[in-house]
Amino acid sequence: MGHQLRAQFANAHQDVLLLDAGDRAAIEGYLLARDLVSDGELPSRVERAGAGNMNLTLRVSLRSRSLILKQGRPWVEQYDHIAAPWERTVIEGQFYEAVRSVRAVSGRMPELLAIDRKNHVLVLEDAGSTGDFTSMYEDRRISQPDLTELLDWLSALGSVTIPDQWQRRFANRAMRDLNHEHIFSLPLAAQNGLDLDRITEGLACAAAELKRDRAYCWHVSELGTAYLWDGGALVHGDYFPGSWVRAADGIRIIDPEFCFLGVREFDYGVMLAHLALARAGVEAARQVLAASDREHLMDTMVLGFAGVEITRRLIGVAQLPLPYGIDTKRHLLDVSRSLVLAPERRLACWS
């Protein structure tokens, strides 16, 4: 099926260049033709950048600098039998353009060097190859300065104003529908094709118990409706440790391809969920809630979104490198249930 999608697309769009990590000459020619590099910077070295699922992301190392090329194709790169919205990379580029004048936001993101709308390619500054924050799941901690920096970025994002004429650009409806399916629907579907016991023995039984909780499923559905609301705030849409990159001078935020105009509570909830999944201390969680309170956001929605994100990362398709057995995963599903059904208890379930 994956080869079918590629072949069908290539036949229908013969004028679109599909980047190939193994074709260095073609990539050098692409960059030269767009005046993004000079002859004196070549030859280059081309390699995959990161372990992202959605897109082809390449690091092009030149004589004295490096670039990131990111191309979204109409399939999920790691699961190329799954179709995905082709416009996502262009919308991500529009996010970079929209925040450019707000230095507290753009200064903590790679610089956008070019958008190729025909081939759906972004050319970005290389934020560095020292890794992202997914080591949190092993380390079970995040430093207070790092957490403060991440929350300051979210606060600054809340100050970004999108002009009326740009509003439709950021509906990002196709990507939001895809995300909605994988966050709010698929994990709790009775027959979703996931063999959870292959991931962790006993996880299928734990998931079945949660799926039988009608109140929980109803509240998740309501939160899914809230996620689909068109709001006035620019939302990153995937604010988790894989989108936080360690650079020499601090943190860089990447991959806003799921961005949309909606409710800010979603980003805070996702962030809170990953602190729970990393088993970070309750003080870190309190810091997130204190920050959302300062932004006058709805606690019930932040906590609810956190609960849903915990569940989808445990029993959904988008698995994480979690070093836990079934007892810890059952406990985390209980945390999710409490956050969704009893948000008035706030962090009483946290441990």
Which residues does each predicted region cover?
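Short secondary-structure junctions
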Residues: D35-L42, R103-R108, E295-H296
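Active-site catalytic-loop/activation-segment of kinase and kinase-like phosphoryl-transfer enzymes
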Residues: G2-G22, R168-L223, I315
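Regulatory N- and C-terminal appendages and interdomain linkers associated
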Residues: M1-E47, Q319-S351
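ATP-binding pocket architecture of kinase catalytic cores
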Residues: A49, L58-R169
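Active-site acidic catalytic loop and adjacent metal/ATP-binding pocket
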Residues: E47-L69, C217-F266
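Active-site Asp-x-Gly
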Residues: Q78-R88, G232-L234, V245-Q287
